Amino acid sequence: MKIKFTLLLMACLLLFAGQGEAKKWVSLFNGKDLNGWTVHGKAKWSVENGVLVGVGGMGHIYADAVCTDFEAKGMFRISSDPGSKSNSGFYFRCNPPADNIDGFPRGYEAQICHNQDAYSGWLWKPGTPTGKATELLTKDNEWFEYHIKMVGEHIQFWINGKLVMTYDDKEYKTGHFAIQGHNPGMKIEAKELYYREVK
């Protein structure tokens, strides 16, 4: 009986140790420079006071990290000049288009936008709103936390800790994380970007 209990205890310890490894958060952004990221398009990217900043028009910055089943989280803020619209997105399981027809990543986008019908919390695929958010919880010039989880075909978004979107889709299997600069006159800022694999 004692031997069985010892073996059971060892099995539990090994199980929890494995889960601990699977749940380790990994930083996507070092807060100092663009190391670990690749720029595509016209948008200009820089680091200011520990914040990743994108301005100047359409373009995307891709993280080197590749994700399949994962959780990701980060703090985001968008703003725009008078007369312009603020629009951005946090992409996942995405890759640059091979033919660069429109420059948009091929993958999933967690929308960041406060002034259109498909606002922050919506799921987009290239040019198409796909999963609808339950409510708008973000504003221009205010930081908010995005938390994304995708395992297999199941996608979930949380904003500031509140679940706002669930959807199932199987088109894109694996790819990078990316952030979008959408149009002139707007600015996207991001910090505290992390992800972890889910096994």
Model-identified regions with their sequence ranges:
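Bacterial N-terminal signal peptides that target proteins for export
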Residues: 1-7
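Carbohydrate-interacting regions of secretory-pathway proteins
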Residues: 20-199
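Bacterial N-terminal signal peptides
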Residues: 7-16
